[in-house]
Amino acid sequence: MLREELNEKDTWDLTTIFANNEEFEKAFNNANIEIENIKKYENIMINSSDELYQTTKTIYEVGEKIDRIYTYANLKYSEDTSNNDSQTLMGRAQELYKKFSEATVFYDTKLISLDEETFEKYISENKNLREYEIVLRNAYKYKPHTLSDAEEKLLAAFQKERGTASDIYETFTASDLTFGKIKDENGKEVELTDTNYSLYMKSQNPEVRKSAFKTLYKTYEQYQNTFASIYAGQIEVEKTCAKVRGYKSAMEAALFADDVTPEVYDNIVNSISNHLDVLFKYYRMKKRVLGLNDMHIYDVYVPLISNFERNYTYDEAVNEVLEATHIFGDEYVNILKQGYKDRWVDVYPNKGKRGGAFSGGCATTNPFILLNFQGTEYDVSTLAHESGHSMHSYFTRKNNPLQYADYRIFVAEVPSTVNELVLAYYRLEHTENKLEKLSILNSLLELYKATIYRQIMFAEFEKTTHELSEKGEVLTAELLNKEYYEINEKYFGGEIILDKEISYEWMRIPHFYYNFYVYKYAIGLTGASKIVKRIRAKEPHALEDYFEFLKIGNKKNPIESLKVAGVDFTNTNVFDSAIQIFDELIDEFEKLYKEL
């Protein structure tokens, strides 16, 4: 379907950002002028607390105008990436953003050049400046890790090269690897790719699963030394950069921005290690349901039950999400309902439209949602998920000034996952169809297994490999394969036959090049589980705590923000609620399955 063939009510209303092209061009031209005016602050910024306030205030105000322009261009481009006008618009917005970044590059350097006594004096003496205290402290905290101007320029010159290992990995895996052919369920010879591999791992035919598994990893085995060199190079660069900047480790450097300590990271990994018995219970149940005497590692992705698929109209999806979120009260539902009515959502696929789904916007726009809705249960869950992001953005922006009207990636997946969970519970409670219930339970079980256990397994491997490197160990393919196999032994606990090829799986995980990122996936589901458990149990202040969390923005760091919602990642029992839910879901699935 072409963009112009869509019904207007099913598209997002971007006229709420700019009513027409003239408005956009006026804003664009004014922004260019204001960017030039920022440059005058460079030499006076730290002369007094008032100059620091004026500089900071101006940068945030101009930055928001740039964000508004960029948001408009990005959303126009996303709705039809093949449209020449939208391509041009996007290019112009990107150049404007680059110009703004270059014009403000002096800010952090100047701020950090203040001695601590003067920095504290400026904040204490200036009431207006104290409105920006948290963002100022977030920038100033890098002072001990900032080098001289000459050294910083030298490091900046190598910034592109810092991503070389990741670039090589991406190019090599996307363009150069081939995996040969396998026979599918119908005996037809098909080309195996890294993309369709996951489909064959869910095949009901064990020979197809085995063939896909063995064939894929045969290729990775051939290039194991190359992958080891790439990954070791990535770790070496991050280790060196951390050392140069005065961090104790690459882990400490990577976690520093979110105010997360290595101790908190270790607590997260260790907490899951204390709950592996529930994961083993899941695999034992899966083995029984699938009727397998022996369960190989290539059997773990087979669905417990073929998905029960309902078809939804978009209106039905909206109604189901609104009904499910009634658990949060009328205020939440009424705002979301009005958002749908006010065309926050771009609903259907069209030619040239960006794939997938996202929630996007900035502090002065609506929290728009892009979907590619085709009526599946997954699409309804996606609507709930993205609506969770958008409602988080709505409450954050409505309750904070510009400088705090956003939130960090660390907490971003919590409200979206909360919505996914309440939708799943709503569905379970409002259907009598046992197959549908089993399908929902199967999806939830896979969600917990993949998002908590698997991601933390990756996080543990990443921690181990960095520690080995920092001890002076050479990260050979043999060593990496051994460490990865042993971590798999720990997480599969003798319940699964670990074919030797699983040793090579670390080679196909791109997240290891994101530098201590994977643990954040577990944060979202763990936090959401605790919040939903509290709300469903009608714990005192559970709803109030959740709304306070939604409204807090960047006024607190991520760990402290989640504490407001009743989730404490410094506590060793932080995963208890999520694991308890996982445990209960296993029991519920098996009990219901026996009733078929």
Where are these regions (language model features)?
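Post-HEXXH active-site segment of zinc metalloproteases
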Residues: 381-382, 393-417
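Short pre-active-site segment immediately N-terminal to the catalytic Zn-binding motif
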Residues: 309-314, 364-384
